[in-house]
């Protein structure tokens, strides 16, 4: 994952000191892009252990269209706890926008179903897009979407995906985002009978929180291991039929986890 280490180094060396919503402070750059060839392995960090269980369950939760953390809690995933209200609700966040984007007539658009149908029908379309950034709903969300907009692209029988992430917490959030969208691309490729292309990750405000600087330096001192391999149950052909048990990570060798506080 040299490309991720390059991002951390770039922000440490070139980042601007900025204030932020949480009051923590950041080193920040604007506009940065990483590219991962998904045929070369699953882009899960090896210079610190990453909690893959949380990544998979969160993605399945998004695909359910859920906006309550009950499913996550039932499966031991706590990454959304800080933002949920007393009943576990988050407002119309990712899953709602992906699966139930509201229409003026009172109906809803299932963007995931529609984009998969469009990939199958017209893979050369330039409209293979899913957006979580609904301006009308942003104020109702406990946390507006950080990974806001993604687009699929098909060439030579390979599926690629580009994500635009408006706000990127490089140390804690970005490793999850890379793995999550790489996995989503693999799932969509399988149900559309396509091979794997690239995951392109475009960052808007890419930042390291000031209370993560020592952790970043520790991680940069570590040598990466070879990337692991993600196996997906080949029998699943419906994007909404995937279950946690359908994913198997092989040959994952990593350095120990590095703890850091979450900025809320």
From Swiss-Prot:
The keyword Transferase applies. (6R)-5,10-methylene-5,6,7,8-tetrahydrofolate binds at residues 51, 169, 263. It is found in: Cytoplasm. DUMP binds at residues 21, 126-127, 166-169, 177, 207-209. The active site is at residue 146. Its EC number is 2.1.1.45. One of its GO terms (biological process) is methylation. The keyword Transferase applies. Belongs to the thymidylate synthase family. Bacterial-type ThyA subfamily. This is Thymidylate synthase. The lineage of its organism: Bacteria, Pseudomonadati, Pseudomonadota, Betaproteobacteria, Nitrosomonadales.
